[in-house]
Structure formats: C-alpha cells, structure tokens
Curated annotation (Swiss-Prot):
Its EC number is 3.5.1.47. This is N-acetyldiaminopimelate deacetylase. Belongs to the peptidase M20A family. N-acetyldiaminopimelate deacetylase subfamily. It comes from Bacillus cereus (strain ATCC 10987 / NRS 248). InterPro entries: AcetylDAP_deacetylase (IPR023905), Amidohydrolase (IPR017439), Bact_exopeptidase_dim_dom (IPR036264), Peptidase_M20 (IPR002933), Peptidase_M20_dimer (IPR011650). GO terms for biological process: diaminopimelate biosynthetic process; lysine biosynthetic process via diaminopimelate. Catalyzes the conversion of N-acetyl-diaminopimelate to diaminopimelate and acetate. NCBIfam families: amidohydrolases. The keyword Amino-acid biosynthesis applies. Keywords: Amino-acid biosynthesis, Diaminopimelate biosynthesis, Hydrolase, Lysine biosynthesis.
Length: 376
C-alpha cells in the first residue's frame, strides 16, 4: 500500500511521543520538515520545545493563527501498530500526532500558494501538562507575531471521518488538577491509639468530596470531581503516616470552579482538625475554559457547511480540558472537533484514529484559510 506524505509524517511522529517540555525529538522533526519548505517568505522561531512559524502574506492586513499541540502521554501503547511508539511507556493517545501533521500540511499549502494575510503556526508543547499555551502566549517570541484570529482542532474518536463538530460560546470546561498530601503519625497496627491513620483520613476525605458537587453547584450548571489515585502506607501491619490523593476538578463556569475549590479547602481543613494531621493542597495545572468567539465560529461553520465536503455538527459543551482556552482569552478564535472514527477513545492505549481524516482536514482548512485570508 502506498502511504501518502502526510500519513507518513503522522506515523513518524507517532513513534516518538514525548512528555511536556521534553519534546526535543518532535521539535527537531518539525524543524527538519520546515527546512524542506523554507523560502524568503517563511520565518521560524524556537520557543522552549515548541516551534513558531510565520508565512508572510502577499498584502497582509491581519494575522491568522493555527495552533497544534505536540506532546504525548505516559501511556503504554496497545495499538499493535507497526509504527507504534519506540519510547517505552509513552504514547500519542490524544491525537497530537495528527494535530501536528495537519499543521504541517496546512503550512505546506500556505508556502505553496501564499494568501494575502500573514499566517502563524504555533506548534505548542505541554498541553497535557504542565501547560504550554499560556507561557507561549506570553513569550517574547510570539509577541511580534501575535495572531488577530486563531483556530485549533482536537480529534474526536466518536465522530466519523468527514465530520467536524463545534459550537458558538463554551466548548470545553475549566479544569484543574487536584493533589492533597496528608501527614499524621504512623505506628504499629496493634497500637492504633498511639497513631493517627492517614489511610482512614484519606478515605474520609474521598467520601466527603462526593458531596461538594451535589450540594454546592447549581444543578443547572455542571461540575465533577474525580479522585483517580490514592497512595499511602508501606506494609499491612503499619498504620500509615502519610497518604496522597490525586484527581481533577472540571466545571463549566469559572464561578463554580472557585466555589468548588473553596469547599474542598474547607473540607480538608476539617480533616486536619478531625485527624490531627497536616494537609497540603496543590492544584497543579489549571486550564481556562475554551470559549469560542460566536461570530467567527458561526462564520466558520457556515463556510465549511456550504463550501467544503465536510459535514458540520453543532455539538454540546464537553468536560474536556484544553489549555487552548488561554489563547482564546486573548485572541478571538475557535476550536472544533475533527471526526476520526476510532473504536477506542482519547487517552486509551488502543486509540487508532482513521488516517483518512488527516488529508481531509488539510484540504478543508486550506480552503477556509484562503477564504478568510482575503476577507477584512
């Protein structure tokens, strides 16, 4: 079977997933590819492990931006691909290999046939954590090339190839990591009265957290707290001195995020008093909601529906987290789901996006950018 140029690029990238801010091989791959395109109209900047590329327009009045996240996840791959990850314990399980490939395809088209406006491509590291969008947005490297309009996409396993889905306004939730470390006094299992058990304390905390959403968030709003990991103790006959909870908070409104965190802090303070222990809360990476610019999104959906071969679906908002939300706080723009028809979902070890979606995305995005690049 003959593999197209951009499918091969995706497969090359799929082999080398890297954790946030350590995407050195990915960065070099992107730079090497751009080097094959370079001409007098292309400028390149390196920012940490990311890459920023500008294609000068013929008669620029604005700057259109495309953002692609480039990092992988600490997941052991189970796809059975011949081109599976060569980095043990790492996988492109969220489609960032496709996001990057589509960006390189769109860049190739932009160099081949320049539009009136300038185009800026942001190959952004660390979306999965600790978050690269905000520091890239604030960087000196981007300051003089800051887009006036920006767009981004995310693969959607549940939608068929040839489909995009988006909506005006709120698309993705506010998200925050949650880490709670408890420290008390350990001891022998035969003498529980001389210790204060941090496994019991952690268990009480998990149980109490379940009421935060149901009794503090408007039922017409949406929020969720998930505790995904608990660690504590050493062996079966020693009362644990320490325990740790790890989870996430997701809310559709900024106000709910603030309220939920306030209640978590009050409950943790109660655990400290009840179990005579010390507690430390760390919110880790926090991502602002993805809020699509209404007029630009409406215009994009209409264009794609009427002037391309893609099908457009108006979706509902999702509890997904995306640091692209920080860029949309500063720059008008939008994000959309790209259908890739995979049996397994995002962050799954068996995620297998349909590669046909790659060239379909490049083609219709090139159509959109050329159209948008000739409009005021």
């Amino acid at each position: 079977m003959v593999v197209s140029k951009f499918v091969q690029i995706r497969r090359d990238l799929h082999k080398i997933p890297e954790i946030g801010f350590k995407e050195w091989k990915t960065q070099q791959y992107i730079l090497d590819y751009i080097g094959t395109l370079s001409n007098e109209h292309v400028e390149v900047k390196v920012w940490r492990t990311g890459v920023i590329v500008k294609v000068k327009g013929r008669n620029p009045e604005k700057v259109i931006g495309y953002r692609a996240d480039i990092d992988g996840l600490p997941i052991t791959e189970e796809t059975g691909y011949e081109f599976a990850s060569v980095h043990e314990g790492m996988m492109h399980a969220c489609g960032h290999d496709l996001h990057t490939t589509i960006g390189l395809g769109l860049l190739t088209a932009a160099v081949t046939e320049r539009i009136d406006d300038d185009l800026v491509f942001l190959f952004q590291p660390a979306e999965e954590g600790p978050g690269g969008a905000l520091p890239m947005l604030e960087s000196e490297e981007l300051k003089e090339w800051k887009p006036n309009i920006i767009l981004g996409l995310h693969i959607a396993p549940e939608y068929p190839v040839g489909t995009i889905a988006t909506k005006e306004g709120l698309l993705f939730a506010n998200t925050s990591e949650l880490y709670v470390d408890l420290k008390g006094k350990g001891g022998h299992a035969a003498y529980p009265h001389t210790a204060n058990d941090m496994i019991v304390a952690a268990s009480h905390l998990v149980t109490q957290l379940q009421s935060v959403i149901s009794r503090n968030v408007n039922p017409l709003d949406s929020a969720v707290i998930t505790i995904g990991k608990i660690t504590g103790g050493t062996v079966q006959n020693i009362i644990a001195e320490k325990s740790r909870l790890e989870g996430t908070i997701r809310t559709l409104s900024v106000e709910s995020m603030s309220r939920v965190k306030s209640r978590i802090e009050a409950i943790v303070a109660g655990i400290e008093a009840s179990f005579q222990c010390e507690a430390v809360i760390d919110y880790g990476a926090m991502y602002h909601q993805v809020y699509n610019h209404e007029a630009l999104t409406r215009e994009f959906m209409q264009f794609v529906s009427e002037q391309t071969d893609m099908k457009v679906i108006t979706c509902t908002e999702a509890m997904t987290g995306e640091d692209f939300g920080y860029m949309l706080q500063e720059i008008p723009g939008f994000m959309f789901w790209l259908g890739v028809n995979s049996e397994y979902g995002l962050h799954h070890a068996k995620l297998k996006p349909d590669e046909e979606a790659i060239e379909k995305a490049i083609v219709f995005l090139d159509q959109y950018v050329k159209w948008k690049g000739t409009r005021k």
